[in-house]
Each structure stands twice: as structure tokens, then as C-alpha cells.
């Protein structure tokens, strides 16, 4: 059998296809949908500029769930949380969870934010456009933070809360923490133009 005839059908978690549509052209270059069995690159991107753009988007979500706090450094736990959340997303929507995640990132990525500029000891806040890489970082951070905050002191498991957060963000629903944060950031930027 030749290598040309051998087609590998690699799916994330052994279930989900990575052939999804990215509507936002500015984010297309920075959302990596590279098919991998196990989303764990081991930080090989760390020393390259824009290296994290080549890290699979599912692994970047896993890394955000692993942020400081109770789950710091527990990648296997974060892996299982995302895996179960994807199953819940599929059961609730009937769609590919990776497609739902990409739609949630597109909807919850802020386009404009505020930065501080200092002129002669006086601080001015100026609205600036957000780079595509930072837009994805902020969207993933807000999705993970919203899920963690909502699952704290809540009988629902974090997998279910994460699935609800991703679905709400994909539907552009304002009950999602990520959508609320995006609207708040853009409102502050609009007022400081």
C-alpha cells in the first residue's frame, strides 16, 4: 500500500472532525484546526513568535481551563472536562462541538478595547483595535472564566456549565459571560474614542 492511498482520518478525542467553517476572515489564520488525536503539544510553540497560532484551538481551551486556581497544572483534568463538555454540546445541539466552539470564539472576541496613554503626567484612555491573536486569547479566557465562576458553589458539574457557556456564546446570547464581557469592553472603548 502506498502512502498516497493511505488516508488517516484523525479526529479530536477520536470523535470530532476538524473540518469546520471559520466565518471571520481576520481570525482564520490564528485558529488552528490541525487534526490531532491528543491535544497536547507540550509547549513546543513557546519560543517562537506567534507560535501559539499553530496550537490546536481545543488545546488552547484546555490550557485556559488550567489557569491559576484549583486546577492549575492539572492538564488531564482539564482534558476530561473539555472532552465531556464536547459530548454535552453534541447532545444538546446535534452539531460538531468544534464548530460550535469556533462560532463561540468568533462571537465573543472583542474588536476594540481601551489602552492607557500618558501625556505630561495625565493619563488618557484611548480606544484601539484588538489584534486577531489577542481577540482569540480574550475570547477563550472569558469562556473559561465564565464557566469556572458559574460552576463554583453550584451543584452542576463544570463540564455542563462549560458546555452551556460555549453554546450561549455560539448563539450570541447575552447570558454568556464571554458575550457580556465583550459588550462591556466594546462599550468602554466606544465611550473613550
Swiss-Prot record:
Consequence of changing residue 150 to S: In strain: MT-4
Keyword vocabulary terms for this entry: Ribonucleoprotein, Ribosomal protein, RNA-binding, rRNA-binding
GO cellular component, one term: cytosolic small ribosomal subunit
Entries under InterPro entries matching the protein: Ribosomal_uS7, Ribosomal_uS7_arc, Ribosomal_uS7_CS, Ribosomal_uS7_dom, Ribosomal_uS7_dom_sf, Ribosomal_uS7_euk/arc
Pfam family, one: Ribosomal_S7
Function text: One of the primary rRNA binding proteins, it binds directly to 16S rRNA where it nucleates assembly of the head domain of the 30S subunit. Is located at the subunit interface close to the decoding center.
UniProt-listed HAMAP family: Ribosomal_uS7_A
Name of the molecule in the record: Small ribosomal subunit protein uS7
Source organism (scientific name): Saccharolobus solfataricus (strain ATCC 35092 / DSM 1617 / JCM 11322 / P2)
